[in-house]
Every structure is written in structure tokens, then in C-alpha cells.
Amino acid sequence: MKIEYQETTNDLLARIDIHKKYGSRDIDQWILHLLDPQKGSAVLDVGCGSGKQCFLFYKVLEGDADITGGDVNRELLEKARQENAKIGNRIKLIDLNFNQRFPLNDDQYDLLTSCFAIYYSEDIPFTISEMHRVIKPGGRLFTTGPMPENKRLFYDIIYEATQLPIPPMPGSSRYSSQIFKAIQEQFLKVEVHIFENPLVFENVEPFLAYTRASLSEDRRLWKTLFEDTGGFEHVMQQINNVATQRIAQKGKLVMTKVVGGFIATK
């Protein structure tokens, strides 16, 4: 199934920044606690984007690891390459489309991560099989993605504002079902871990910034709500009205990110 999706650097980084400023928990520390990555490991991050996970592993392992990041988005990869240059290009960055055979050898990595990316695959079983192929026997796959109850407030406000059905999201609509099943079928065992991070907005501006970045980043997914810039701005004004009313009534907006972390062993 082809996913209509377009990711941009500015929108992605805006959401990451808002998570940091308004969330009460650090997902990076949660990931490190779960995985306990070891020095000397070979690590691959699939769908690495601007390199966030690669640089996290590089820092915590003090550079003592063979780290590779791959992505199909050239804009985000260029951002990663700019950051990589600052550390002497210690991370290998490659063009990698997870809808195609990975340009990598079998049994190569101790740890393969794919954070908030795998659900954009057009053929989930194929992508999982490629991940399985390049992981060493006994190695691990770690994926993250939104669970069905993720940021319920966000969708409730959009529905109240537009009175239009929320389109199915590639993540929350199939991460805990189709993707989890595909991983179970190909790996020896799978652990499920849940991360919850309440984002608290005491005024409407950061919530609107998050919403604007989300709708803009995923604009191909939201095409049933607006067709052009004028339609987008009209929807944003409707959302502004509803969000402002809710803050006036309750004093704040609390939007909880609910993320599933799957750890699979080959």
C-alpha cells in the first residue's frame, strides 16, 4: 500500500522541539534504558531522518560503535550530514529506501532501530524481512510508533473544529496491529513497552504550532480537510477557536503522546 506522505525538515524539527519544551518525559532516555546499547556494537538506524538516533547512540557510546543511518529523504539526510561533519563524519549515512532491498550485507548489525518511520512502508512484511536479513543472529530490532490512543486530544480538537472524519493515520492505524504481527511472524520473540508523555499547553500558541507542523508535515494525509493554502489556514483558524475555548474552560490543554516500543530478537 502506497502511503501519501511528505516529511520536511522544519516541520519535523518543530514537533521534536515542542516535545522537549512541553513534555514531562524524555523519550531518548527511555530508549537508552530499554536498549542499553553496548560499545563495539554495529548499529543501523532505518529512517534516520536528520540523524537524531544516530547522534544519540554516538554520544552515549562515546564514539565506540559502528553506526550507520539510512533514509530516503534527501533534505533530512543533508541535515544529518551537516551535523555529522561536526564530529568528523564518524557516522556512516546512506541512501536507504525501505521499500527496496537494503544495500547491505546479511547478518551485519547487532542492533537495528527504526523510530517513527516503519509505518510509512508500502509493504510491511517485505520491510521487516529486510530488517531481519541484515541483523545478526541474536541481534535486536527496535521500533517505535504511535499507539491507537496516541494524542487523542489533538484529534478530538480537529474533529470538533471541522466536523470532518479524521483520516486514518499510517502509524496509529496499523502500528500495534499489522506491523506488530509482521514482526512477531519473523522474529523469535517480541517485547512490548509503552511510553507516555503528557504535553501540557497553558496557552494556545504552542499547541497551534504543533498542530500546524503536524498538518503541514503530513499534509498529503490530511487532504480531506483542506486542498490549498487558503483551506489550510481556514482549518487552522477553526482549530484555534476550539483550542482557545478549551483553555478558557480548563486552564490548559494536556495532549498525551502514547508510544509503543517493540524489541524483537532474531
Region spans (language model):
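Conserved class I S-adenosyl-L-methionine
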Residues: M1-Q38, K52-L56
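Conserved Class I S-adenosyl-L-methionine
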Residues: E4, S50-K52, S173-S177, Q186-K266
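Class I SAM-dependent methyltransferase SAM/SAH-binding core
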Residues: A42-V46, S50-Q100
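A short acidic, Gly/Pro-enriched loop at the edge of an enzyme's catalytic core
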Residues: F102-L111
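A short SAM/SAH-binding and catalytic strip from SAM-dependent methyltransferases
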Residues: L111-D123
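Conserved catalytic/acceptor-binding region of the Class I
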Residues: P125, R140-N203
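A short glycine-rich, Lys/Arg-flanked "PGG" loop and its adjoining helix->strand segment in the class I
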Residues: P125-P137
